[in-house]
Amino acid sequence: QMCIRDSSNILPLISDNFKAFADEVGAKVKAKLWEPWLNTYKKAQYQDVHDHAEHYFAAIIFMNEGVDFAKLYFMDRQKSFSPPFIQNVFQMDDVWYPRVGKGDIIIFPGHMLHGVSPHKNDEIRKTLSLNIDVIEAQLL
């Protein structure tokens, strides 16, 4: 992980997307965007499952993509509370891999468990990540 020296062009991009997200759910939000950091993954590198529970939301910008690139995944820590027959009937899985590509931004609750699968390409995988805290919020 590397800190970004000048995030002045990145933060407005995330801010605009977070505002669009808030509009979609019918909320007016004032948020604090924390300084982003760069994640790089060389071949065979990965990220263990973790969360950002000390923040309301986290965001990831995907800087590049390729064949056999490491994949972001989310884990459902509540799956074990569903009876096995419900898990089978509704084909519930405890891991979900969102489809993302270069330039995509994904924003998710900070408490969600997530990780990155092993990188299998010689090209370095790059993402920018940051945390978001909600200062004020109201329903529209």
Question: PLM features: residue spans?
Answer:
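Acidic, low-complexity intrinsically disordered segments
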Residues: 10-25
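A short coil-to-beta-strand element that immediately follows conserved catalytic motifs
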Residues: 26-36
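Ligand-binding loop in jelly-roll beta-barrel domains
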Residues: 113-127
